Amino acid sequence: MNEYVFINFNVGHKSIIACIGSNENSFLSLISDAFSSQIVSYSHNVDVKINASFDISLTHFNSAFNDYKSARCGLLVNSFKNDMHFEILSLFNSNELHKAAFREIRDFIECLLQKESILTLHSACVSNKDGAICIIGDKFAGKSTLMLKALSLGYNFVSNDKPFLYLMNSSFYAFSLPVSAGIRYGSISMFPDLEYAIKKQVFSEHVEFSTNGRVHLTPRALCEVFNIDYVNNVKIKKFIFLSTSYSNKPNFKSSSRSIERNVLFCNDRNLFDALMASSIIFCKSYEEAVIELER
């Protein structure tokens, strides 16, 4: 018998309710943990139905093979009813398959959200009681290091990369899907508590090591180390652009190009124009950006 969890995605004044069902409670526990800041107890008004079935019969798997698409780890996936119903089938049952199914669901939800009036940025995002700070920057500028510094100062975690932004009452708000933060080893060494937790495998199930010099940490791992919360739908009080290429204050043309190339997705020109018209603080060093965090 399937059990269910309900997730609420707020995009401005609109709520999108997803109902995720599965025959494996351990998989639903993973979903509940990952989407902890967006879980609701129950809803009659379901917009999207998602189901993940594990350890199904070979007959069932073979009969679905021609109608479904192959995905990660040999999962079969398909969407129905104008993408309002998403199905995942697995012949086997394991933690790795659960993680693969979770990633399929997350990618599917991202595609649904891109039908709304949203913008995604190549940026990190943190928040405290006064509002959120969105840290924009090119690769290797130090966004993740600055994000970790903010968490060490007591900011809550929103996103390490690619937050979703929307406008409500003329202000930008940010939320994210649960994506692990890829942190370079050099950045980790700057935060002893984080380095210790990784080395001692305090939360090994929430940590993955890659071959490109990064450690991937789930939002749960970051929250446990820094004793903070994973939050969503927070009002942005400040945009910071972290750069290492400016010897002087950038001019309007160069700063506009810098922001524009870090917009990953936008389906609403008004949203894009509002971002470009926002007051964005350009910092030419990590130290300068830390001062902005502490203001």
Predicted regions and their residues:
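Long, basic/Gly/Ser/Thr-rich N-terminal segments
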Residues: 1-96, 293-295
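Glycine-rich, often acidic-flanked micro-motifs
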Residues: 2-12, 16, 21-23, 27-30, ...
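Conserved short hydrophobic interaction patches
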Residues: 33-38, 108-111, 153
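Short N-terminal helix-initiation segments at or just after the protein's N-terminus
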Residues: 64-75, 97, 177-187, 226
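Flexible, glycine/proline-enriched loop segments at strand-loop-helix junctions
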Residues: 92-99, 135-138
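N-terminal pre-Walker A segment at the start of P-loop NTPase domains
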Residues: 97-120
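Conserved lysine of the Walker
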Residues: 143
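Post-Walker A alpha-helix
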Residues: 146-147
